Amino acid sequence: MSLTNTKTGFSVKDILDLPDTNDEEGSVAEGPEEENEGPEPAKRAGPLGQGALDAVQSLPLKNPFYDSSDNPYTRWLASTEGLQYSLHGLAAGAPPQDSSSKSPEPSADESPDNDKETPGGGGDAGKKRKRRVLFSKAQTYELERRFRQQRYLSAPEREHLASLIRLTPTQVKIWFQNHRYKMKRARAEKGMEVTPLPSPRRVAVPVLVRDGKPCHALKAQDLAAATFQAGIPFSAYSAQSLQHMQYNAQYSSASTPQYPTAHPLVQAQQWTW
């Protein structure tokens, strides 16, 4: 019994530095009652806890387990609380970022609809997004080619075109409506209204042969009558141009010799005689 007492006394007095064994027994006896009462840190911190704390503080391990000067990541490790706050902030701001990434630039027409939408109206938003279909290059080319041929399509033609390019008739109808409006707005901006094409211009050709005879000397009256019959008004020609044409006709008749027998019409008349 004396050996056990000395062992317990050595461990208690020298290591825990307790003043009396009676106090130890009282503290041990009171321990279960305190545990039954509830967690009270003020009552638990008796002379036993203080002695253990003093013993730990007297140990030579007062420095940290690693030297902060040798660790290159101390600037991030020193601000762990700031990182936690930033992570909470990112987690809180993540849902609106996801929602904005789905619709980065809502149009002006869709903004009031989005304001009116409620959390339960997610199906309507999905339907609206499905209606906005991006046409492929082949589909757009075929639609534009058909639009150049025919600006308005009937119901059977619309269905046939939709089946060819794998679209619905409603999508084809809406595309044609939008394209017509776009073309009309472009013409209005450029100031180009739809006008009928002008009739082809008629050019007056001088009469060289009349009634089987060459007309070398033309008078102004004959030329005016010829141009009037051709469809060009006489006012289109000035008097100076008429004189110039008459002079050229006279010069050509004077320079070229007259050979009546060489004319094919004259030969035909001679044979008929």
Curated annotation (Swiss-Prot):
Region (Disordered), start-end ranges: 1-56, 90-131
Stored Gene3D superfamilies: Homeodomain-like
Predominant cellular place of this UniProt entry's protein: nucleus
One Pfam family here: Homeodomain
Residue ranges for the DNA-binding region feature of this UniProt entry: 128-187
Biased composition range(s): Acidic residues: 20-38
GO CC annotation terms, alphabetical: chromatin; nucleoplasm; nucleus
Localization: Nucleus
Keywords, in A-Z order: Activator, Developmental protein, DNA-binding, Homeobox, Nucleus, Transcription, Transcription regulation
SUPFAM superfamilies: Homeodomain-like
GO biological processes: astrocyte differentiation; brain development; cell differentiation; digestive tract development; negative regulation of neuron differentiation; neuroendocrine cell differentiation; neuron fate specification; oligodendrocyte development
Gene Ontology MF: a single term: DNA-binding transcription activator activity, RNA polymerase II-specific
Domain notes: The homeodomain is essential for interaction with OLIG2.
UniProt similarity note: Belongs to the NK-2 homeobox family.
Subunit description: Interacts with OLIG2.
Function: Transcriptional activator involved in the development of insulin-producting beta cells in the endocrine pancreas. May also be involved in specifying diencephalic neuromeric boundaries, and in controlling the expression of genes that play a role in axonal guidance. Binds to elements within the NEUROD1 promoter.
Protein name, per record: Homeobox protein Nkx-2.2
Source species: Homo sapiens (Human)
Gene giving rise to this polypeptide: NKX2-2
